[in-house]
């Protein structure tokens, strides 16, 4: 489906003048952000359409009830169009950025005045092919450009800026088809569909009236009959959520819960979540030494991170020795499982401490005696009493006799000694024990008391 435009409309210069005025208004709209480099408004000098545009309707959908609305997909083709605009720019970039630049970075210039340059930009041989969605309603026409193919020739009065401006225009051309042209077409269609007898001064009043009609109230989305189909349980939940969030306070409205919304942790309740995490400090502080709960929360608690609580035993628990190693191991294992929940192969690193007591000489002697008593069978043998000779003077003593230093009254001689492996180590460290007595060299005696080199006699 296609149709032709009226050639008389494009042949008359009034159409081009109307397009020029609308385009100038759109480019100088107060809602647009004005660039600092522009020292004046943008003026559209000339608009020309020597070739009549072509419009091909690809799809059309007309809805008469309940609203009069026509939807269509169209293909627009335009050739040999021309556009010329003029403005004034500021060439002194130091003056533009003076307000936003710190004073210590600005050089001390002799003259930092304004230097404006008038510039004229001409777009010629404009060729446009676009696929558009058109919505036709009583107030006007709304159009949106989906697929745009644009080509043009650009000429600038300042040749040194021509390449830079052309590159930036091609990069920002999507803004023209997204915002400028749709608003221009809509405003033109509003003026076109209104009665010719009415003045243009009544158009803003009608636009405000149309805006008031299209403003949606609360009852537009849900009517009174729609509330009967809603679940009362869902409505109760929604009302509780809304009431819990209708506050500007940093503290929670419900002090006994972690969050007013299930599954959502709020910032003001973070310290409660941290206090319930398994740690040595939290466990022993809550069990053995309970602290009074207060409804007020300090600012330090709100911003205090988890690592500041220190996974350590409180000093009072250490002083009173009220800790349990099994409980500590369980808490540390839970902390390890929480931190390595994604890694199944991770194993905790246990610190093993071997407790070894240092052996004193008294302990060594007692352990050696106990080992010998347990591992050896000792038979008590009465020793032969020996009369201790009376020491004489040094001149009267025979040369082959010597007095002993000391003689023990009782000495036990083991007949059979069976040593264990453990007792060998201990007995090797013991000092040797010797029996020292008289050594008789007479041939009449068949025995002699043992010295260091010879053992005592056995009977």
From Swiss-Prot:
Transmembrane portions of the chain: none
Alphabetized CDD domains for the sequence: SMP_Mdm34
Post-translational modification as stated in the protein's UniProt record: Ubiquitinated by a SCF (SKP1-CUL1-F-box protein) E3 ubiquitin-protein ligase complex containing the F-box protein MDM30. Ubiquitination is important for mitochondrial integrity.
Annotated compartments: Mitochondrion outer membrane
Keywords associated with the record: Lipid transport, Lipid-binding, Membrane, Mitochondrion, Mitochondrion outer membrane, Transmembrane, Transmembrane beta strand, Transport, Ubl conjugation
Record's compositionally biased regions (Basic residues): 348-359
UniProt region (Disordered), positions on chain: 338-375
Domain SMP-LTD: 1-190
GO biological process, one term: phospholipid transport
Keyword Mitochondrion recorded: yes
Subunit structure: Component of the ER-mitochondria encounter structure (ERMES) or MDM complex, composed of MMM1, MDM10, MDM12 and MDM34.
Record-stated family: Belongs to the MDM34 family.
Record's function text: Component of the ERMES/MDM complex, which serves as a molecular tether to connect the endoplasmic reticulum (ER) and mitochondria. Components of this complex are involved in the control of mitochondrial shape and protein biogenesis, and function in nonvesicular lipid trafficking between the ER and mitochondria. MDM34 is required for the interaction of the ER-resident membrane protein MMM1 and the outer mitochondrial membrane-resident beta-barrel protein MDM10.
PANTHER family to which the protein is assigned, alphabetical: MITOCHONDRIAL DISTRIBUTION AND MORPHOLOGY PROTEIN 34
Further facts: Present with 377 molecules/cell in log phase SD medium.
UniProt protein name: Mitochondrial distribution and morphology protein 34
């Amino acid at each position: 489906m296609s149709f032709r435009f009226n050639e008389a409309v494009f042949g008359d210069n009034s159409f081009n003048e109307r397009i020029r005025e609308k385009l100038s208004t759109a480019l100088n709209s107060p809602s647009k952000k004005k660039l600092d480099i522009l020292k004046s408004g943008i003026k559209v000098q000339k608009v020309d359409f020597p070739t009549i545009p072509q419009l091909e309707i690809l799809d059309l959908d007309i809805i008469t009830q309940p609203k009069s609305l026509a939807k269509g997909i169209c293909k627009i083709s335009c050739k040999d169009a021309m556009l010329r605009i003029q403005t004034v720019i500021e060439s002194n970039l130091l003056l533009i950025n003076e307000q936003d630049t710190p004073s210590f970075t600005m050089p001390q210039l002799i003259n930092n005045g304004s230097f404006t340059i008038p510039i004229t930009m001409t777009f010629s041989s404009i060729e446009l092919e676009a696929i558009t969605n058109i919505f036709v309603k009583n107030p006007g026409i709304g159009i949106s450009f989906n697929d745009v193919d644009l080509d043009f020739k650009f000429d600038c009065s300042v040749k040194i800026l021509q390449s830079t401006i052309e590159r930036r225009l091609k990069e920002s051309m999507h803004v023209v088809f997204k915002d400028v042209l749709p608003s221009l077409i809509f405003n033109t269609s509003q003026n076109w569909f209104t009665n010719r007898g009415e003045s243009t001064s009544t158009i803003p009043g009608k636009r405000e009236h149309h805006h008031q009609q299209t403003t949606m109230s609360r009852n537009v989305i849900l009517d009174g009959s729609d509330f009967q189909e809603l679940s009362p349980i869902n409505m109760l939940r929604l009302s509780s959520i809304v009431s819990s969030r209708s506050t500007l306070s940093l503290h929670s409205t419900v002090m006994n819960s972690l969050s007013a919304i299930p599954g959502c942790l709020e910032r003001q309740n973070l310290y409660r979540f941290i206090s319930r995490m398994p740690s040595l400090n939290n466990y022993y502080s809550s069990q053995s030494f309970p602290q009074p709960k207060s409804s007020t929360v300090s600012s330090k608690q709100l911003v205090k991170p988890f690592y500041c609580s220190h996974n350590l035993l409180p000093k009072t628990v250490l002083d009173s020795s009220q800790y349990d190693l099994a409980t500590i191991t369980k808490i540390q294992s839970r902390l390890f499982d929480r931190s390595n929940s994604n890694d199944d192969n991770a194993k905790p690193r246990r610190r093993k401490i071997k407790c070894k007591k240092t052996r004193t000489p008294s302990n060594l002697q007692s352990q050696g005696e106990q080992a010998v008593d347990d591992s050896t069978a000792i038979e008590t043998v009465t020793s032969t009493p020996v009369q201790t000779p009376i020491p004489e003077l040094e001149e009267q003593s025979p040369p082959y006799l010597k007095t002993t230093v000391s003689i023990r009254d009782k000495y036990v001689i083991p007949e059979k000694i069976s040593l264990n492996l453990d007792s060998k180590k201990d007995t090797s460290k013991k000092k040797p024990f010797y029996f020292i007595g008289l050594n008789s060299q007479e041939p009449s005696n068949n025995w002699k008391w043992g010295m260091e080199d010879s053992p005592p006699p056995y009977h």
